[in-house]
């Protein structure tokens, strides 16, 4: 009996010593969250005389918190212009926010450029097509390092060093710098000013490009207004500069609990042809309704940018878009270029 008691005591001492060497916790390790979205479309092109259905895009996202940091990755498979499917790393972000200085965040990877109102993924927009300003006048994606500082509940600052505009692998030795200030003067208004500077042409650092971009978001009751202005230039040779400017405005009005109407006007003046390859002025008007239902799961992207509009799980959007160019641009059925075109889109977006 005495021997058995000694054995129990010795086991207890051994267990206590092991517990001192290793912290015992009953907290569960945070799981990896898997989310994503799928997009199906029906398109009509008046000038090209084409129409068809496409299962256009699937995006799968992984989110893993780890203490003060998290990892977010998104793989996107989409159809290109030739109808071939291609998969790319759309986002890959390692982010760290220290507990003792949680107003600072350091992030590295590939991420959405903190500019403007529009984004590249369909669930993050209110209308099923992107503007000319988003496509040409400013970067949509950056690959590099980002520092975010929350100076106050109303003021946020960003600084970014990246490879360049929408490039995953650097095409020259220089780097692109971005600085942004975002201010909330009243709870339903957000104002942002962004400057971008750096070489963007392949194999040379001499042709520096600069961009000044400002954006305004108003989220008031049933109305959302998103607007942006872009002014840019690039040194071409010697002291010569190519310039461009553009503006886009989007208005969304909620007319019922699950129904809204969106309209957008977009103008981009590429008078030197640097961005589009042809000196021209591009304009577009897009109008259409959106029916939406349920709320998508919480994640790194939960709302339309700078608004309280929570991403719906299901959204059915239709739009008619009229495009104009000061030069023949839109190919018709015979291959000839026309100066105007009208397209129609019916898009289903499902977030899972």
Model-derived features with residue positions:
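Compositionally biased regions
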Residues: 4-8, 12, 19, 191, ...
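Hydrophobic alpha-helical membrane context
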Residues: 14-15, 69, 276
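Outer membrane beta-barrel
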Residues: 21-166, 173-178, 182-191, 250-262, ...
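Short glycine/proline-enriched turns and hinge-like loops at secondary-structure junctions
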Residues: 85-87, 170-174, 206-207, 240-243
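Outer-membrane beta-barrel pore domains
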Residues: 46-48, 92-96, 110, 119, ...
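N-terminal periplasmic/intermembrane-space "pro-region" immediately following the signal or transit peptide
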Residues: 5-44, 297-304, 347, 352
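Intrinsic disorder/low-complexity segments
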Residues: 5, 15-19, 34, 53, ...
């Amino acid at each position: 009996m005495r021997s058995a008691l000694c054995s129990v005591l010795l086991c207890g001492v051994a267990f206590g010593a092991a517990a001192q060497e290793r912290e015992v916790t009953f907290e569960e390790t945070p799981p990896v969250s898997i989310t994503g979205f799928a997009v199906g479309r029906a398109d009509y092109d008046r000038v090209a005389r084409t129409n068809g259905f496409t299962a256009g895009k699937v995006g799968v996202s992984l989110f893993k918190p780890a203490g003060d940091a998290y990892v977010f990755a998104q793989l996107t498979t989409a159809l290109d212009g030739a109808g071939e499917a291609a998969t790319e790393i759309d986002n890959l972000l390692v982010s760290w926010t220290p507990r003792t200085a949680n107003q600072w965040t350091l992030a590295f990877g590939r991420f959405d450029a903190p500019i403007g109102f529009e984004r590249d993924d369909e669930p993050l927009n209110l209308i099923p097509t992107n503007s000319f300003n988003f496509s040409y006048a400013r970067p949509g994606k950056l690959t590099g390092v980002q520092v975010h500082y929350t100076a106050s509940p109303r003021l946020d600052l960003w600084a970014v060093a990246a490879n360049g505009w929408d490039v995953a692998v650097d095409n020259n030795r220089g780097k692109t710098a971005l600085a942004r200030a975002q201010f909330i003067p009243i709870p339903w208004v957000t104002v942002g000013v962004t400057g971008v500077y750096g070489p963007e042409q392949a194999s040379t650092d001499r042709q520096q490009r600069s961009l000044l971009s400002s954006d305004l978001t108003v989220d008031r009751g049933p109305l959302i207004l998103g607007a942006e202005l872009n002014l840019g230039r690039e040194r071409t040779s010697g002291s010569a500069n190519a310039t461009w400017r553009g503006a886009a405005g989007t208005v969304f009005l909620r007319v019922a609990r699950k129904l809204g109407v969106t309209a957008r006007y977009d103008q981009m003046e590429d008078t030197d042809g640097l961005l589009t390859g042809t000196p021209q002025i591009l304009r577009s008007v897009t109008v259409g309704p959106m029916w939406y239902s349920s709320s998508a799961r919480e994640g790194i992207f939960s709302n339309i940018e700078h608004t309280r509009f929570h991403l719906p799980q299901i959204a059915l959007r239709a739009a008619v878009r009229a495009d104009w160019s000061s030069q023949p641009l839109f190919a018709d059925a015979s291959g000839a270029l026309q100066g105007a075109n009208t397209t129609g889109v019916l898009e289903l977006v499902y977030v899972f």
